[in-house]
């Protein structure tokens, strides 16, 4: 979490973001599944971050990506971020059309462990009802990135895209399995980023035009 905060702060202090800019967090997450009405409890979380803060977020027993009940490669746009340690909640504004399902995500400081499975369900019961149909997402960076980004961006300038890679079996995942799971999500994410670039270009033109009109008006007044 600290690494994510430091990365955002470093980038944004080296180049001050402009009103037309966007902060987009693209990362992986675990999907905490829960069958409503079945009395089933969900797996809880604890994790060990690896390579470049990429965020592998959960830990469970003996399943490959192909054997999981969740579908690896699903992409979600986060509409609500809940910080597990502090209980704080953050709401990125989703103003533009997109092709993704929207979900609520919990950001924790540790890996997802089955031993703690009774903790998350009661605490995030509302998230279970309002987020993905059978659970919610879990990562280790979204809330930190939001809080660091809030110094430079408005809520409408921040987007959080999460690709599901596991449901709690991160110890059994290899780099190749993760690569395969994420590969299918790339085209949709690329299209979304292209749309944001178009919006960014339009905003810059509008700002430039507005500045020109202000300058012209100032000259007339003088």
Features from the language model and the residues they span:
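Acidic, Ala/Val/Gly-enriched low-complexity intrinsically disordered segments
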Residues: 45-54, 60, 65
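Glycine-rich phosphate- or other oxyanion-binding loops that anchor nucleotides, phosphorylated ligands
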Residues: 1-38, 61-222
């Amino acid at each position: 979490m600290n690494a994510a905060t430091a990365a955002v702060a470093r980038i944004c202090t080296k180049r001050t973001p402009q009103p037309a800019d966007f902060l987009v967090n693209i990362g992986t997450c675990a999907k905490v599944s829960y069958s409503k009405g079945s009395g089933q409890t969900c797996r809880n979380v604890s994790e060990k971050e690896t390579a470049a803060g990429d965020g592998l977020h959960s830990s469970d027993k003996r399943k490959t990506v192909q054997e999981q009940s969740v579908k690896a490669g699903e992409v979600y746009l986060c509409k609500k971020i809940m910080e597990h340690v502090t209980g704080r909640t953050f709401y990125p504004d989703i103003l533009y059309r997109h092709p993704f399902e929207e979900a609520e995500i919990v950001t924790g400081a540790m890996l997802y462990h089955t031993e703690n499975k009774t903790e998350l369900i009661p605490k995030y019961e509302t998230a279970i009802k309002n987020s993905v149909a059978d659970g919610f997402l879990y990562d280790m960076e979204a809330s930190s990135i939001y809080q660091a980004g809030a110094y430079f961006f408005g809520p409408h300038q921040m987007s959080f895209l999460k690709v599901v890679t596991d449901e709690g079996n991160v110890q059994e995942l290899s780099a190749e399995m993760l690569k395969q799971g994420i590969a299918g999500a790339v085209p949709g994410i690329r299209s979304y980023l292209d749309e944001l670039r178009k919006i960014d270009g339009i905003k810059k033109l509008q700002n430039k035009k507005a500045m020109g009109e202000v300058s012209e008006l100032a000259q007339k007044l003088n």
